[in-house]
């Protein structure tokens, strides 16, 4: 039976083998990461294991989905067996051996392929994260065992489903099952309207998110609404559209349109679910591909934005919240405002190690974890407003850093935000400030704690005294003085010297410079960046392969199913006078009408979601929307080419079936 149905079973077995190989490779790579004891292995292991468990979930769904196509094609065959004298228990026995053989072939081929490629994939992971590696052949038997166990469970449920679906039907129903769906579906206006409403609501959620926190909270509800809307519109909306086309006599009463439209109306109920699935999976591929490529390609820019100099020191100055006069009165140089002990320690350490500091950046910063509501920010706990990270800078630092020449009166402020809608006058913990001007662009990546999934707002105030007053006001609202806010002094600088001298400076800085709460050395942080974003790209590749496999399989089986359904119908059309050329043109037109609709909808989905995705990417320190846009467009083009290739191959198979 499997040989006779090779056109159906071969792609199924290939997909099962590919997914078994993916599971084995992911499992074995996670084992190799642990055994290697490499630096940053915890992050890589966690991401690979998360990817492994998510892949298990999708493998179950994909196998059940494709198995349903196969069973639909074979139910008529099983009905014939029953009429010829086979009992249900005999059919169950046949199904058992077919499922067992499928599982055995898939495991043998998948694990064998996984063993061959697992070490190469491990080296690819090391390449992505910037670590050296060498090719060593090994087989983690733990990975073999877990892959076998997963497939045993999965195929057990597939077998139970197949046996139940066959045993519940009588022979007549089995013979008739492959023809199900030929009755013209009714126009379900309510479902079409509900789908349009759900899709519209999902789009509105995506387009009205102004901050990273809103984007994270709205993302999954928006995804659910878009999925519901997509399925409803493909199933109910498409039928309504086709029937509207049928009423257009000028369009409908042409041979190619007549056959295509009438044929699609009769089968759209079963066809629409597959098209909607293709659309959702295509969107998943585009989102995953564009996001992973953007994060990986932009990791060096993100590193330099977040850590603008080689040495980045954050010094906490609690006394400034008590006494604004602790700053010296000299205003001639930038260094006059730097706490003397920190500045002296940097100079002393530079001299003792033989290094020179250069390209320094120095500025005060006050950070307040606040709630926002109606132009008011407060640090009080239990406030019902939206979460916001509030940064305060003084005007002198802002003008110096950005080459500006703003002037502010007392009670005025410049304002920048990633989404918080503040207009007119702002209330910060009881202190009133009039917004003199909104800043359109601000490099928030240089601020301590910027990579948070909440709204980010920056107030530039006239002087340090304003920052001290705001720090006191914010702390006064915090009960029991828990987690008080302090003013920080950021000291960023590059360092020049021999390799040994620079290493000595970096090693001694944390212990010899007073007041340091955090110190980041860019060359050391770079390894952590590469480990994180390289691992994200690695697991993204597996998700892309998985989603592409599911997409191609659904397309392939949809074309085969439609081909068999259309074969008799087009045979009749040839008998009543249509030429082979007209039949082929009609087939091509029909396939084009439905084939590229999911791709078009997927492009619309990702275009609408792009602003929300940009906000979500800031959680990963990705603030370069232009780079993300470039990779999104590139992903659409690459996927479009792959989609076109699949179309050409499956259209050829479809035509062969119809013409046979």
What name fits each language-model region?
Residues 1-7:
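Aromatic- and glycine-rich beta-strand/loop motifs that create alpha-glucan
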Residues 4, 73-83, 173-177, 243-250, ...:
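Short amphipathic alpha-helical coupling elements at transmembrane boundaries
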Residues 7-34, 43-79, 100-113, 227, ...:
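Hydrophobic alpha-helical transmembrane segments of multi-pass inner-membrane transport and secretion
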Residues 10-16, 21-25, 149-154, 183-300, ...:
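Alpha-helical transmembrane segments, especially those used as permease/efflux helices
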Residues 20-32, 65-69, 102-131, 143-168, ...:
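Small-residue-rich transmembrane alpha-helices
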Residues 168-182, 564, 655-660:
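Short cytosolic juxtamembrane segments of multi-pass membrane proteins
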Residues 302-549:
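Basic-flanked hydrophobic alpha-helices used for secretion and membrane insertion
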């Amino acid at each position: 039976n499997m040989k006779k149905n090779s056109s159906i079973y071969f792609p199924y077995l290939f997909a099962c083998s590919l997914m078994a190989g993916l599971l084995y490779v992911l499992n074995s790579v996670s084992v190799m990461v642990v055994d290697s004891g490499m630096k940053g292995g915890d992050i890589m292991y966690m991401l690979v294991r998360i990817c492994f468990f998510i892949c298990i979930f999708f493998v179950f769904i994909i196998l059940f989905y494709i198995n349903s196509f196969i069973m639909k094609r074979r139910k008529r065959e099983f009905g014939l067996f029953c009429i010829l004298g086979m009992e249900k228990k005999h059919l169950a026995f046949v199904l058992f051996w077919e499922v067992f053989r499928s599982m055995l072939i898939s495991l043998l081929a998948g694990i064998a392929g996984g063993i061959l490629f697992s070490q190469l994939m491990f080296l690819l992971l090391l390449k992505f994260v910037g670590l050296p590696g060498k090719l060593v052949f090994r087989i983690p038997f733990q990975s073999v065992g877990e892959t076998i166990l997963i497939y045993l469970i999965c195929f057990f449920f597939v077998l139970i489903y197949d046996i139940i679906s066959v045993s519940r039907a009588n022979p007549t129903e089995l013979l008739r099952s492959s023809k199900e769906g030929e009755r013209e579906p009714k126009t379900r206006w309510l479902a079409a309207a509900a789908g349009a409403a759900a899709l519209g609501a999902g789009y509105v959620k995506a387009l009205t998110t102004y901050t990273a926190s809103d984007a994270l909270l709205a993302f999954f509800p928006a995804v659910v609404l878009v999925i519901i809307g997509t399925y409803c519109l493909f199933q109910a909306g498409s039928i309504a559209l086709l029937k509207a086309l049928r009423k257009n006599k000028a369009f409908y009463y042409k041979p190619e349109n007549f056959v295509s439209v009438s044929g699609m109306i009769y089968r759209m109920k079963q066809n629409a679910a597959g098209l909607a699935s293709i659309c959702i999976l295509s969107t998943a591929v585009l989102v995953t591909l564009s996001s992973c490529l953007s994060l990986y390609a932009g990791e060096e820019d993100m590193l330099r934005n977040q850590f603008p100099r080689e040495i980045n020191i954050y010094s906490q100055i609690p006394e400034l919240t008590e006494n604004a006069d602790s700053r010296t009165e000299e205003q001639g140089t930038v260094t006059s405002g730097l706490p003397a002990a920190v500045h002296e320690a940097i100079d002393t350490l530079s001299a003792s190690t033989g290094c020179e500091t250069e390209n320094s950046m120095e500025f005060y910063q006050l950070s307040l974890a606040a709630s926002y509501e109606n132009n008011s920010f407060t640090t009080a706990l239990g406030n019902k407003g939206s979460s916001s990270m509030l940064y305060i800078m003084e005007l002198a630092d802002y003008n110096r850093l950005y080459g500006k020449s703003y002037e502010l009166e007392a009670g005025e402020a410049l304002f920048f935000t990633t989404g918080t809608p503040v207009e007119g006058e702002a209330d910060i913990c009881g202190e009133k400030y009039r917004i003199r001007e909104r800043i359109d662009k601000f490099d928030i990546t240089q601020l301590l704690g910027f990579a948070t999934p909440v709204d980010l707002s920056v107030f530039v105030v006239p002087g340090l005294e304003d920052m001290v007053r705001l720090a006191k006001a914010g702390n006064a609202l915090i009960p029991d003085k828990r987690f008080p806010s302090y003013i920080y002094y950021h000291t960023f600088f590059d360092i020049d010297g021999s390799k040994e001298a620079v290493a000595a400076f970096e090693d001694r800085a944390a212990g010899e410079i007073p007041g340091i709460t955090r110190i980041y050395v860019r060359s050391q942080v770079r390894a952590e960046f590469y480990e994180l974003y390289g691992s994200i790209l690695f697991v993204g590749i597996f998700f892309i392969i998985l989603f592409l496999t599911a997409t191609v399989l659904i397309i392939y089986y949809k074309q085969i199913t439609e081909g068999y359904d259309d074969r008799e119908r087009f045979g009749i059309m040839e008998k009543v006078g249509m030429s082979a050329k007209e039949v082929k043109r009609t087939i091509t037109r029909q396939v084009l009408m439905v084939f590229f609709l999911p791709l078009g909808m997927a492009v619309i989905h990702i275009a609408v979601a792009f602003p929300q995705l940009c906000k979500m990417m800031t959680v990963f320190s990705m603030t370069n929307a232009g780079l993300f846009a470039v990779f999104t467009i590139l992903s659409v083009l690459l996927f479009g080419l792959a989609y076109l290739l699949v179309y050409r191959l499956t259209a050829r198979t479809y035509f062969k079936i119809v013409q046979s």
